[in-house]
């Protein structure tokens, strides 16, 4: 209930500014639209990705380690540095977010002071780069701590707007690493 109280004011402010749905059929199909032939042909990587947590975690490990892992160089160090460079702050729908020049979200605990939505999104993910998906999925990495992390739930939870399930596992991984060092 506390989470709902955090986001209700922002949702109420948006209700007067209804935007058309970006793809025809979304109203009728709901989440099933992500499996439609049209959506799959669009190859929209930020929505409806078909991947496993293991595959995403391997890629996140590469990103967290300067572009290479297990003796395989997938991205040059300069390419990796450019990918993470020049974060800027922009409003994305109902809250402020920080993105690099390559479109990576950068999470900063300090952004939590801006409001309850920013706190829900950022607090507990300080220093991580990457993305989250509708329903609870998390694909992020932490270059300073050299952590690659992915969580892909089997049960879609559309009301988990801040991906709290994945965040709890993410925090546990960071705590384990901090305990070991």
Predicted regions and their residues:
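Generic structural signal for well-ordered, non-membrane alpha-helical segments
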Residues: 49-52, 76, 166
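Short, well-ordered beta-strand elements
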Residues: 140, 146-155
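Short Gly/Pro-enriched loop/turn and capping motifs at secondary-structure junctions
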Residues: 109-110, 155-158
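Bacterial peptidoglycan biogenesis and beta-lactam-recognition machinery
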Residues: 56, 60-75
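A structural signal for well-ordered alpha-helical segments within the folded catalytic domains
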Residues: 53-58, 167, 171
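Short, gly/Ser/Thr-rich active-site loops of penicillin-recognizing serine hydrolases
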Residues: 65-68, 78-79, 84-92, 159-181
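Active-site Gly/Thr loop motif
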Residues: 1-47, 51-53, 85-144, 180
């Amino acid at each position: 209930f506390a989470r709902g109280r955090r986001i209700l004011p922002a949702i109420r402010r948006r209700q007067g500014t209804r935007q058309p749905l970006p793809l025809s059929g979304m109203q009728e199909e709901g989440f099933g639209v992500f499996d439609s032939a049209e959506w799959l042909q669009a190859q929209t990587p930020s929505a409806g990705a078909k991947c496993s947590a293991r595959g995403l975690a391997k890629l996140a490990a590469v990103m967290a380690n300067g572009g290479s892992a297990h003796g395989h160089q997938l991205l040059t160090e300069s390419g990796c540095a450019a990918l993470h460079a020049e974060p800027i702050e922009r409003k994305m729908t109902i809250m402020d977010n920080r993105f690099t020049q390559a479109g990576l979200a950068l999470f900063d605990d300090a952004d939590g002071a801006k409001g309850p939505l920013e706190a829900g999104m950022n607090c507990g993910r300080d220093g991580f780069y990457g993305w989250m998906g509708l329903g609870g999925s998390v694909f992020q990495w932490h270059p300073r701590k050299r952590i690659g992390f992915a969580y892909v739930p089997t049960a879609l939870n559309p009301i988990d707007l801040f991906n709290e399930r994945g965040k709890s596992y993410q925090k546990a991984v960071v705590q384990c690493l901090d305990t070991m060092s």
